[in-house]
């Protein structure tokens, strides 16, 4: 049975047992920033990160998704696949080869059509990243986006109908009740 939930692990370090998030559904890593578990998927758009991930035990068994140009160079490596064509990429002004891996991970989560996306360690202090997150959320009203943070709670997503912020405590309760 397909899960309704997916977790996107951003670029920031996370002090949370990420293995627990698997109870909720698939987990997507943003490049090689957090190596705490074996992920279902990882997005990568630089050759250096991809090589590092291919040589890391934590990414064995992880589907590594890269933009087409990078994928073509690594087509014969196990686990390396091409990112899907994301609808509306040009309207978001997002270049898969130049944007952050966490933006790619967010796009992948939306593409996989889960109803709830949990954002853990996701960097919204960068105005470009926050704007892209909000644009993607607005363009996908059927998907809920829950930004997980430590107290105090941030209010940067409160202007979105389908985006909100909550604490790791609430996230842990969700996991425990899964």
Region roles according to the model:
Residues 1-178:
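Metal-ion/cofactor- or nucleotide/acyl-coenzyme-handling active-site neighborhoods
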């Amino acid at each position: 049975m397909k899960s309704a939930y997916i977790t996107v692990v951003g670029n920031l370090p996370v002090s949370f047992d990420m293995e627990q998030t698997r109870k909720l559904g698939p987990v997507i890593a943003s490049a090689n920033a957090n190596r705490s578990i074996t992920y279902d998927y990882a997005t990568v758009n630089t050759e250096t990160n991809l090589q590092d991930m291919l040589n890391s035990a934590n990414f064995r068994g992880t589907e590594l998704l890269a933009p087409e140009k990078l994928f073509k160079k690594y087509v014969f490596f196990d686990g390396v696949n091409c990112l899907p064509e994301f609808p509306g990429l040009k309207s978001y002004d997002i270049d898969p080869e130049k944007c952050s891996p966490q933006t790619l991970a967010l796009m992948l989560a939306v593409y996989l059509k889960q109803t709830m996306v949990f954002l853990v360690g996701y960097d919204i202090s960068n105005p470009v990243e926050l704007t892209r997150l909000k644009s993607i959320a607005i363009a996908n009203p059927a998907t809920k986006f829950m930004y997980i943070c430590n107290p105090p709670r941030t209010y940067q997503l409160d202007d979105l109908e389908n985006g909100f912020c909550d604490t790791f405590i609430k996230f842990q309760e969700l996991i425990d009740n899964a």
